[in-house]
């Protein structure tokens, strides 16, 4: 009684390569706000390279462009819009306390 061992095979899913976020015709420039705003988080921070899926050179150029736009006040340094409004504060009752002796 011999056991038949089947070789392990990986499932053949179709691998779809993601399109690069910056096309060949896109110029990385501090005035190109539609391009720059794609690489900034909601808080106004520059997104990291692994999130952006950019090359090292592209990430460097994007970072420089964002910093130039911030200095020229085209972009804010921080986005301080409050997302959550404060709920009404609970008023504490001030009454007499009884002590246990």
UniProtKB/Swiss-Prot annotation:
This protein's record includes keyword Membrane: no
UniProt entry keywords in alphabetical sequence: Chloroplast, Plastid, Ribonucleoprotein, Ribosomal protein, RNA-binding, rRNA-binding
Signal peptide: none
InterPro entries listed in its UniProt record: Ribosomal_bS18 (IPR001648), Ribosomal_bS18_CS (IPR018275), Ribosomal_bS18_sf (IPR036870)
Single Gene Ontology BP annotation: translation
GO CC, one annotated term: mitochondrial small ribosomal subunit
Localization terms from the record: Plastid, Chloroplast
Annotated transmembrane regions: none
GO MF entries: small ribosomal subunit rRNA binding; structural constituent of ribosome
Keyword Chloroplast belongs to the record: yes
PROSITE patterns with a match to the protein in the record: RIBOSOMAL_S18
Chief location category: plastid
Tree of life domain: Eukaryota
Pfam short name (any one): Ribosomal_S18
Subunit structure as annotated in this protein's UniProt entry: Part of the 30S ribosomal subunit.
PANTHER family: 30S RIBOSOMAL PROTEIN S18, SMALL RIBOSOMAL SUBUNIT PROTEIN BS18M
Similarity comment: family membership: Belongs to the bacterial ribosomal protein bS18 family.
Protein name: Small ribosomal subunit protein bS18c
Gene source species: Nymphaea alba (White water-lily)
